[in-house]
UniProtKB/Swiss-Prot annotation:
It catalyses: L-tyrosyl-[protein] + ATP = O-phospho-L-tyrosyl-[protein] + ADP + H(+). The lineage of its organism: Eukaryota, Metazoa, Chordata, Craniata, Vertebrata. Coiled coil: none annotated. One of its GO terms (molecular function) is non-membrane spanning protein tyrosine kinase activity. This is Tyrosine-protein kinase CSK.
Length: 450
């Protein structure tokens, strides 16, 4: 086996591990944390030609940067890798063997349901401390109270504060990976000190979306404070590390705070959601070229997801954002999964979801195609809610009997044909996104959209 690392191909993204001031004129200086893109290999394998975010090119040392990788699919990321759930006192003691002072884990309490137990190895034996849950706060001594388990563990890591020892080494639950370690390893961890949060631009059930500044660039930041919700959003962030396309909202990085906060930092989309953009401008402002361009933007993003075996599951105009220069980009990867998995259908948007996905939880690229047809209808109706004048409870029974919405007012017949093809009840007869893109490009070339 050769120990020589394979050369990074052109287009590879790297993140700087150290500052590099450059010594020669052809060098490209950079700061720790900068993202650089490889342009070409040089004769010397220790140096690459690269460019920075403003397009300046130069030579960089390979050992000063690390390649950015996607977080591996299937990696079980955890904000609390030391949390072992429902295990018994005896199981906890076996896990903390051989004894090592400061080795710890947290489990659910068996004697006091709803409470937790902190188990710590100390001078050859294991101590079990009950963590009481009272008035939405956690405490061991009823003197110091914490919002969540992460804050509690962080406190006792810095100071024993009455315990037999401070917490030194987490006993990681088998099969899980500490989220911060994994984002750092793969080059996606950002530095909180360099992020300025400026103003709230959206509120969700999970937390706020804020306009921020990261190293002089405008960014959007999802701020998730609740540890359980943050855990769910880790999956979204790890999917985003694997995806890169000009019509997908780009992840810039992730910040995992010791106290349990999670910040997902993405490019800032100045003109907001496509549905609001359409409603606020309407027919008098947006012509046929503009509507078809948005349709193609989304289709190209979905063709990329299709080619990479990802299913979005929540495609709708509310989950497409518009940039300063009027490019539509697909966002909200909260439900995006590798194509093979199934999902609970409790919270699915009925009017956008394919019948087989609602009925049998069968999600596939073809169920995304159904949703794309609905999204086309939203675009050409300037942001109307689909199935107007039909009560929500009646939508699925009517659709399953073959009902299809009429064309929106003024919708070109060729575009309406594309919509209807997306709404075949038999998923297998729906077109692929590649075919849809070709159909939309044909419409554009022959000016059938005007």
């Amino acid at each position: 086996m050769s120990a020589i690392q394979a050369a990074w191909p052109s287009g590879t993204e790297c993140i700087a591990k150290y500052n590099f001031h450059g010594t020669a004129e052809q060098d490209l200086p950079f700061c720790k944390g900068d993202v650089l893109t490889i342009v070409a290999v040089t004769k010397d394998p220790n140096w690459y030609k690269a460019k920075n975010k403003v397009g300046r090119e130069g030579i960089i040392p390979a050992n000063y940067v690390q390649k950015r990788e996607g977080v591996k699919a299937g990696t079980k990321l955890s904000l609390m890798p030391w949390f072992h759930g429902k295990i018994t006192r005896e199981q906890a003691e076996r896990l903390l063997y051989p004894p090592e002072t400061g080795l710890f884990l947290v489990r659910e309490s068996t004697n006091y349901p709803g409470d937790y137990t902190l188990c710590v190895s100390c001078e050859g034996k294991v101590e079990h401390y009950r963590i009481m849950y009272h008035a939405s706060k956690l405490s061991i001594d009823e003197e110091v109270y914490f919002e969540n388990l992460m804050q509690l563990v962080e406190h006792y890591t810095t100071d024993a504060d009455g315990l037999c020892t401070r917490l030194i080494k987490p006993k990681v639950m088998e099969g899980t990976v500490a989220a911060q370690d994994e984002f750092y390893r793969s080059g996606w961890a950002l530095n909180m000190k360099e992020l300025k949060l400026l103003q709230t631009i959206g509120k969700g059930e999970f937390g706020d979306v804020m306009l921020g500044d990261y190293r002089g660039n405008k960014v959007a930041v999802k701020c998730i404070k609740n540890d359980a919700t943050a855990q769910a959003f880790l999956a979204e962030a790890s999917v985003m590390t694997q995806l890169r396309h000009s019509n997908l909202v780009q992840l810039l990085g992730v910040i995992v705070e010791e106290k349990g906060g999670l910040y997902i930092v993405t490019e800032y989309m100045a003109k907001g959601s496509l549905v609001d953009y359409l409603r606020s401008r309407g027919r008098s402002v947006l012509g046929g070229d503009c509507l078809l361009k948005f349709s193609l933007d989304v289709c190209e993003a979905m063709e990329y997801l299709e080619g990479n075996n990802f299913v979005h599951r929540d495609l709708a105009a509310r989950n497409v954002l518009v940039s300063e220069d009027n490019v539509a980009k697909v966002s909200d990867f909260g439900l995006t999964k590798e194509a093979s998995s199934t999902q609970d259908t409790g919270k699915l948007p009925v009017k956008w979801t394919a019948p087989e996905a609602l009925r049998e939880k069968k999600f596939s690229t073809k169920s995304d195609v159904w949703s794309f047809g609905i999204l086309l209808w939203e675009i050409y109706s300037f942001g109307r809610v689909p199935y107007p004048r039909i009560p929500l409870k009646d939508v699925v029974p009517r659709v399953e009997k073959g009902y299809k919405m009429d064309a929106p007012d003024g919708c070109p017949p060729a575009v309406y044909e594309v919509m209807k093809n997306c709404w075949h009840l038999d998923a297998a007869t729906r077109p692929t996104f590649l075919q849809l893109r070709e159909q939309l490009e044909h419409i554009k070339t022959h000016e059938l959209h005007l």
